[in-house]
Amino acid sequence: WFDDAALFACAVLAAWRAGARVLLLPNTARENIGWGETADIFLTDNLVHKQAWHLPECLAQAQRQPENGRQPENWSVPADAEAHLKTSGSSGKAQIIIKTAAQMQAEAQTLAAALPFGRNGEAVIGSVSPQHLYGFTFRFALALTMGWTMERAQAVYPENLLAATAAHRQAVWI
């Protein structure tokens, strides 16, 4: 579970690059934490579970390590990398939806073609978490595909949406 959309994006891309299957919890309810524990590793940016790898601590640890000057030649993500999204169940029983990296990129490109901003868009501001199906599509895939700014915090209240929007020339709300 991630509150910070940028840390979420880093974790998803790193997991995909490593060949891991990503489970996106819709919230931190006990049932969903249990589902998350079926993964090989549970990454988060908050302390929702004591066995989780708290990403800010991992990043701080990594920064203390000696630097490796070599960079991988290819940072690409496999097209068949999977994200498993669990719906909230608000319209019945929660369901698991599987999206591949290729599907997410295709969805993002289709959305980008429909929006009036093109590559000149400024930011994606979300009232939903990046783990949500719409958040994953807009706050993650669309922002990364188009090179737009990803507002890190979820705008829980309307005044948060307005404040975040004021900082950008153009913004997409989700």
Functional labels for PLM-detected ranges:
Residues 1-28, 122-130:
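Conserved AMP-binding/adenylate-forming
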Residues 7-8, 30-34, 47-53:
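Short, charged/polar "capping" segments at the starts of alpha-helices
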Residues 39-47, 98-114, 119-174:
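AMP-binding/adenylate-forming
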